[in-house]
Amino acid sequence: MSLMDNWKTDMESYDEGGLVANPNFEVLATFRYDPGFARQSASKKEIFETPDPRLGLRDEDIRQQIINEDYSSYLRVREVNSGGDLLENIQHPDAWKHDCKTIVCQRVEDMLQVIYERFFLLDEQYQRIRIALSYFKIDFSTSLNDLLKLLVENLINCKEGNSEYHEKIQKMINERQCYKMRVLVSKTGDIRIEAIPMPMEPILKLTTDYDSVSTYFIKTMLNGFLIDSTINWDVVVSSEPLNASAFTSFKTTSRDHYARARVRMQTAINNLRGSEPTSSVSQCEILFSNKSGLLMEGSITNVAVIQKDPNGSKKYVTPRLATGCLCGTMRHYLLRLGLIEEGDIDIGSLTVGNEVLLFNGVMGCIKGTVKTKY
């Protein structure tokens, strides 16, 4: 039985399990827009640099799958060689000083290409949107190029064809502000886009003006792999399993099951910190199992645990999609590069003090440490 078939057998029980708080849910994608992923060369203003191709931000196979409307291939990450060599290089980010590819930016089309490179894993985001819409039987005719245009128009607050369009595009490619992008598609196929400015201070603390574009990407999006990473979230392991369904496998606005868990996480973290139970908390996550006791995911992240291979080397293992975890784009990307691998993880094997890797398409990868079970 395929993963899609497994989801279909669960459809009748969604309402009974209280998973669909809002029957008018929207399919959701959230991802990062970051000018640091395609930025102006220090020596030539018409040249924009993007990360080294070895970092795999663009994949021609994925682009071809989109052209062929083969969206289900997203669920089958092609086999790759071990990412051990790449991981070793990533752990020395300053070694990527001159490794990049370039875009000569002279026309509006070139500027749009620069902006496209700044949307993190946009191709994979589009694939995941399409497969989710197909599952929920939602008609959708927006192409990847159309989606890019809508994203740009939202960021510059100007429609293509407007007399100010060219000027605003030019201004946009020179700005440094990062955004959390939200693409929402209704059950009638209507699309809306939100751009939420991200706090820049935490991002700028991770990098320097002298970093290459590849080094910037590694320090901001692959930070959890770095030996000297200073970011480490507090992690709660939930004692209550999550009911795996299409509403855990796909990202939608029906998220009450996650919201309830984050309230329990808030209480657990405040107990640890000696704070009032309802005090706001940040930089923390709660991890769930499914009803079979297998680790699934976090409330806002996918997760990988650290294990040892037969040679004693560290490896990162993430739950299989069959557990019901979100088919996240960052998860897909890390699997594609061989930086993580899939496996079954008994949630009972997680103990206080264990280090984990947390990741999503907005914050990238960060370290976390299990602090308590609750």
Curated annotation (Swiss-Prot):
One of its GO terms (cellular component) is cytoplasm. Its cofactor is pyridoxal 5'-phosphate. GO terms for molecular function: 4-amino-4-deoxychorismate lyase activity. One of its GO terms (biological process) is carboxylic acid metabolic process. Its main location: cytoplasm. It holds the Pfam family Aminotran_4. Pathway: Cofactor biosynthesis; tetrahydrofolate biosynthesis; 4-aminobenzoate from chorismate: step 2/2. Keywords: Cytoplasm, Folate biosynthesis, Lyase, Pyridoxal phosphate. It is an enzyme of class 4 (lyase). Its EC number is 4.1.3.38. InterPro entries: Aminotrans_IV, Aminotransferase-like, BCAT-like_C, Class-IV_PLP-Dep_Aminotrnsfr. It is found in: Cytoplasm. It catalyses: 4-amino-4-deoxychorismate = 4-aminobenzoate + pyruvate + H(+). The keyword Cytoplasm applies. Homodimer. PANTHER family: AMINO-ACID AMINOTRANSFERASE (PTHR42743), AMINODEOXYCHORISMATE LYASE (PTHR42743:SF11). Present with 768 molecules/cell in log phase SD medium. Belongs to the class-IV pyridoxal-phosphate-dependent aminotransferase family. This is Aminodeoxychorismate lyase. It comes from Saccharomyces cerevisiae (strain ATCC 204508 / S288c). The gene is ABZ2.
